[in-house]
């Protein structure tokens, strides 16, 4: 978010009963004198008093709970700079282990040399995956004699994309070719995708967990379509899987879904460690099936144990604590631990979906049976005067942050509401939410609703 002119309140109120009580403390300039640590702590703490509870935030995919031991370990390693491989070689080794664990989880072929790196989140990971596709496409196209300056290269993706892909296309001058979703295709329409592909296509993005609804693109079917396409042309097109949400969930709960490096044309995958990898924000990961898919000019060398280590990141200095937190989780939970946690989360999501459906007011778009996301709209014949925006507002009064928003272009007339179920949302908390949900509906049914005839569609709450 960009900030500009400060608000009217120029000064913080002095701390009660403290030595600073006799002077004002400026907000937007540095104070002349230092404060006691206790006073500075209390001032900042009080500034955050009226924010929502992270545990009650059903809008965010980001992890809002970690074990005390994990939090302690991360707080003890905040000073470690992840980029300083020579100074912190054991930290570099833990990152290497994480990449190997993820490669194994995503079935990287044993006869190829996978590569991967940590990032500050899936947005950076998507940028890196997109950059690799662009540079690799350019190299292939030049070799085949294509005039790469005749038109902009393009990226094909469904309209359910996360905003980071739009940023990538703007920042790196790529034409985004969007395959629209419709009522019959609430994910990538693989029957239409080849209509958007040509010799200037750097790649196709398949999404394992669409932000709007939680649904999966059919990566297997997409692979089949591109295999057919690639068999007829020298201008090969490959798949990057944006598995920000599903990359650390699907392998444990639905291992039979084939979406990863087992597919011939899937060459790179990103995920968020701070979503279903169960780490606090922000940590992401991106892997390439083989080093041949990662152009050498994007790789930089850093000093490491008297030698050099290849790195590829947009950001530079950052704390290694989240990498260490990710390794802690891998060590702590193992495969069965992750599976148990995610299955419980899935059960909670399906419980919530059933309770929502039982009210009789809603059509369920996603029932949490895959990714633990509950998504629904008001029935056309619901015969109520209130909207999902009203319901979101009423729930917020009870502390729950639940977004309501229109679907992407071509479906923007459909307003939906979504819950993201995370590991810290247990059945007891879910039951409390349903009680508040039902009470909110009852209050709205008894309320005198005004002005909806002129209300414009918008967004209530944070949707990504």
Curated annotation (Swiss-Prot):
<dbReference type="GO" id="GO:0006538">
    <property type="term" value="P:glutamate catabolic process"/>
</dbReference>
<dbReference type="InterPro" id="IPR015421">
    <property type="entry name" value="PyrdxlP-dep_Trfase_major"/>
</dbReference>
<dbReference type="Pfam" id="PF00282">
    <property type="entry name" value="Pyridoxal_deC"/>
</dbReference>
<dbReference type="InterPro" id="IPR010107">
    <property type="entry name" value="Glutamate_decarboxylase"/>
</dbReference>
<dbReference type="GO" id="GO:0004351">
    <property type="term" value="F:glutamate decarboxylase activity"/>
</dbReference>
<dbReference type="GO" id="GO:0004058">
    <property type="term" value="F:aromatic-L-amino-acid decarboxylase activity"/>
</dbReference>
<dbReference type="InterPro" id="IPR002129">
    <property type="entry name" value="PyrdxlP-dep_de-COase"/>
</dbReference>
<keyword id="KW-0210">Decarboxylase</keyword>
<comment type="similarity">
    <text>Belongs to the group II decarboxylase family.</text>
</comment>
<dbReference type="InterPro" id="IPR015424">
    <property type="entry name" value="PyrdxlP-dep_Trfase"/>
</dbReference>
<keyword id="KW-0663">Pyridoxal phosphate</keyword>
<feature type="modified residue" description="N6-(pyridoxal phosphate)lysine">
    <location>
        <position position="275"/>
    </location>
</feature>
<keyword id="KW-0456">Lyase</keyword>
<protein>
    <recommendedName>
        <fullName>Glutamate decarboxylase beta</fullName>
        <ecNumber>4.1.1.15</ecNumber>
    </recommendedName>
</protein>
<dbReference type="GO" id="GO:0005829">
    <property type="term" value="C:cytosol"/>
</dbReference>
<comment type="function">
    <text>Converts internalized glutamate to GABA and increases the internal pH. Involved in glutamate-dependent acid resistance in gastric fluid.</text>
</comment>
<dbReference type="GO" id="GO:0030170">
    <property type="term" value="F:pyridoxal phosphate binding"/>
</dbReference>
